[in-house]
Amino acid sequence: MKGESDFIDALRNRVNRDRGTGRQGETEITPSARLPVTVSASLIAGIGDDAAVFRSTAGKETVITADLLVEDIDFRRTTTPPYLLGHKALAVSLSDIAAMGARPLWSMISIGVPEDVWQTEFVERLYDGVLDLANRYGVQLIGGDTSRTNDNIVIDSIVTGEATAGMSVLRTGASAGDQIFVTGSLGAGAAGLRLIERGAHLAEQNLGDEDSQKLDHILLRQLRPEPRVGWGIVLGEERLATSMIDLSDGLSSDLNHLCTASGVGALIDSALLPIDERVTELCGRRALDPLQLALHGGEDFELLFTVKPADVPRLPRRVDGVGIKCIGTIQSTSEGVKISEGPRTWELKPGGWKHF
């Protein structure tokens, strides 16, 4: 790669040009069709200026989130293709915006890399992953920064979104009697990490075709998480969710975060947890516990949300092909946060990811 200015010029030109279908390659992990980047009339200045400038929208409130990915803490260069790393860097921030019931609009990606990495195609492939995901959700890359590091790669992702004024979904709105729902399935993000730690790679050749597909599905839930942007928008704009959080740290930890913020307790039923069936099958072979992965593993990036009983019939069954499952009920704070398994009930303590 040439210098930073050349890279910025190339990135700006790519973001601004009118694009249709994409490049060849990465067929098993790249969407087959690429949508054009949405260029909003609200954007006054983007990539190439000292800062981005955009007009505020009347009747809207701005939602902003930031996420930091650090090599050897959040990912390993040896097991994460740069395209997928770019995808995940943006996906984790889109998941936060979805958890607020907001619509994502703008993104800024900053990256620090060692000089030997800068001299390869790594950074371009990383931004390919960012831009492909951004295109899918009409998000425009409007800036960021690049810098040199001594050893490890560091990626900072900032995403800005909008919600109708007064309609952002917070963690603080749950009340006793609300039903607790999750999108999608649980456990695959953590199972994928366990497989990577044990040396698994995409499309392992020593397995049969069906087993390889199952393994790749689990690995990609870790390497290429899918943010539930559509569900977030529906739950926010239709005023369906009373509270919401994304499942990045693990169900046990994130449910406790939500209950603490709302000043409530909760009871969930382990039999109702939508554990990915491929995870259950894998755990039987690899001496892993699917319930523990679903409760404490984290990195599923599903949405956990609460709904008043009267609003449950209004919930769509699926959004963007993803369903939901009721897993329990919000209770009074005196009841604590608990989980049941048959006749047995116990306290569900936070057991997920801890940053420090």
Question: For the regions a protein language model found, what residue spans apply to each?
Answer:
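Alpha-helical scaffold segments that flank or form the walls of functional sites
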Residues: 84-100
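Glycine-/charge-enriched secondary-structure boundary and capping motifs
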Residues: 1-13, 17-18, 60, 80, ...
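A short, charged helix-loop
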Residues: 204-226
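Internal active-site segments that recognize and position negatively charged phosphoryl groups
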Residues: 181-184, 224-251
